[in-house]
């Protein structure tokens, strides 16, 4: 459960990301593909090379979904319902992959914003990404 402080930390951090969200989403995806190669199996039709237009486009989708989640942080299930349906029923993404991507998002954000990435912000973002992952996998059951 996200506390008021967690929500504040997430909103403040995401506000500083601003126009870089798509770039960070792309970088996190690339990190995920490199660190967890099995995640590539969900993208057989993609050019997965560094700087690929397809990876950039999907990185932007990830960033847009997270921006939507931040904007509706008090109602994640409704905000992410359509995305949850897509991943559970159509794409059938293994839930562990959300954990992998979450980890790579944390690494990416820490690399780009080391001064702001305090232990409290790290914990808040980790809880937020976990909450998003929980919602995205909630329809698997």
Swiss-Prot record:
Domain Globin: 1-141
Keywords of this entry: Acetylation, Heme, Iron, Metal-binding, Oxygen transport, Phosphoprotein, Transport
Ligand binding (O2): 58
Pfam families recorded: Globin
Modified residues (Phosphotyrosine): 24
Keyword Transport appears in the UniProt entry: yes
Gene Ontology CC, one term: hemoglobin complex
Sites bearing N6-succinyllysine, chain numbering: 7, 11, 16, 40
Protein name, UniProt field: Hemoglobin subunit alpha
Organism: Lynx lynx
């Amino acid at each position: 459960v996200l506390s008021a402080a967690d929500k504040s930390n997430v909103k403040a951090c995401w506000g500083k990301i601003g126009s870089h969200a798509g770039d960070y989403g792309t970088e996190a995806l690339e990190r995920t593909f490199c660190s967890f190669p099995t995640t590539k199996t969900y993208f057989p039709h993609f050019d997965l090379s560094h700087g690929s237009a397809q990876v950039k486009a999907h990185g932007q989708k990830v960033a847009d979904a997270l921006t939507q989640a931040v904007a509706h942080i008090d109602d994640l299930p409704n905000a992410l319902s359509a995305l949850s349906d897509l991943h559970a029923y159509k794409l059938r993404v293994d839930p562990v992959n959300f954990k992998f991507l979450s980890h790579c998002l944390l690494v990416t954000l820490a690399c780009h914003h080391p001064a702001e990435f305090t232990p409290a912000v790290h914990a808040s973002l980790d809880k937020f990404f976990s909450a998003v992952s929980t919602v995205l996998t909630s329809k698997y059951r």
